[in-house]
Amino acid sequence: MTQQSNLKTVTGWALIIVAVFSAYLIKFFDDFNLAFLLFLLFQLVLIFRYKNVFSPGMRTVSRLLLGAVFLYSGFVKGVDPMGTAYRIEDYFVAFGTDWLMFSALFFSFLLNAAELVLGGMLILHIKPKLTSLLVLLMMGVFTLVTLNDALNNPVPDCGCFGDALILTNWQTFYKNLLLNVLVLIVFLHRKSIRRLYPDKTELAIG
């Protein structure tokens, strides 16, 4: 390996390790902290700046970590769909859309199913280009919603991980910023992703 190749490898793994370590640091920042927020945003900038340093192995690790988080989130909420429905009702009240109350349980099942399906597709590497796009869109929505939660506090708890892991609104926003690090690593390399299974196999797995 050349010196430049070694530098790319070190840089890529360093960015991933820093992101994982930052997830641990979230426990110490339960409210707004400008320094920590800038630190997380800087990581996102670095992902764009050094997007070419991520090897296939690094992309795989990022994909598996992201898939595991989606599966965990979908599972812990899925075991208590009514609890998730109550959280959704809180949002309906906060945004003045009380007339949607009747659909809270439906959206609870839909959200949990979407996270479980996307998590499984990430782990199993099914339709990687489509999956990376859908995950990017979902995380974009989640990030905007949790930014509003952090700034305006319309609900006390988004219930992102059900009752298994209670986070403040700012911690939830920080968490989503870090997840976006993994999302970008996967999404920015979607054109170079090779499918592992033919269409019939993917359909059978699904």
Question: How would you describe each model-predicted region?
Answer:
Residues F21-F36, L137-P198:
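Membrane-embedded alpha-helical segments of integral membrane proteins
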Residues Y197-G206:
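Internal/C-terminal transmembrane anchor helices
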